[in-house]
Amino acid sequence: NQEGYDNLESILSVADGVMVARGDLGVEVSTQLVPIYQKSIIKKANEIGKPVITATHMLESMMANPRPTRAEASDVANAVLDGSDCIMLSGETAAGEYPIEAVTTMDIIARAMEELLPYRERLDAAIKSSNKTVQDAIGISVADAALQLDKVKAIVAFTQGGSTARRISKFRPCVPIFAVTFTKSVQRKLETSWGVIPIFSDVQNAMTNDDELASIIAKDNGLKEGDYVIITAGYPTGEGTANMMKIVEVK
């Protein structure tokens, strides 16, 4: 609501993430302000690396029709281009007649938009708002290396509490982030972060054998021998300790 928007920065400082619920927002603010607020909320969440979900009426017509309107397709596309980590359906899947088609349509649009994202511009903008920490420096370096090296097809981030993967996600790399964690709850939490594919591993000594595990994970997720991945982790291990990156060949 309006009060939440007015206090957005203080909310973001303590929240795990934020949702742009356009329906609720539209009850209290003028219609023409909703898209302005949406872009502003997404931008601020992106700047500090907190996941942001855009929701409500995204493919509303698909509750009764197998295809969306062109305006709805544009709405989904713009939510992705604005920087949403997640785009969410509600009634379309909870009560609509075409739930599978709605999810498929949203997926197709999102993937198409991700191909068009100006990754270099996004990275340069994110660098300006970075916290100038070791973890941000690692995230920037990982995203930059992925842009410069065509052979790099993915990032493998070993993460205990999820902060390493979220920090990399903040800088919007152009390849997927395989976030390897040994905790189921962390795996679930990372589902909302942009570009992150959370993977639970029960290989407890993975941090001392990360090259081998990274190759296994890469091949399990569609990469092939000869591709390259960027590995990042923290030594010694612990939440928020990311201080290492290396580029290795999948074998």
Where are these regions (language model features)?
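C-terminal binding/interaction regions
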Residues: 216, 224-232, 236, 242-248
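C-terminal helical cap(s) of enzyme catalytic domains, especially alpha/beta-barrels
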Residues: 93-115, 243-248
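Nucleotide-binding motor/catalytic cores of P-loop/tubulin-like NTPases across gene-expression machines
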Residues: 164-166, 172-209
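Glycine-enriched alpha-helix->loop->beta-strand junction motifs that scaffold or abut catalytic
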Residues: 13-18, 23, 83-85, 172-176, ...
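Conserved alpha/beta-domain cores
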Residues: 1-56, 62-73
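Long, charged amphipathic helices and adjacent flexible linkers at domain junctions
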Residues: 47, 106-143
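Conserved, mostly hydrophobic/aromatic
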Residues: 11, 21, 57, 79, ...
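Glycine-rich phosphate-binding active-site loops on the catalytic face of alpha/beta enzymes
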Residues: 18-29, 76-99
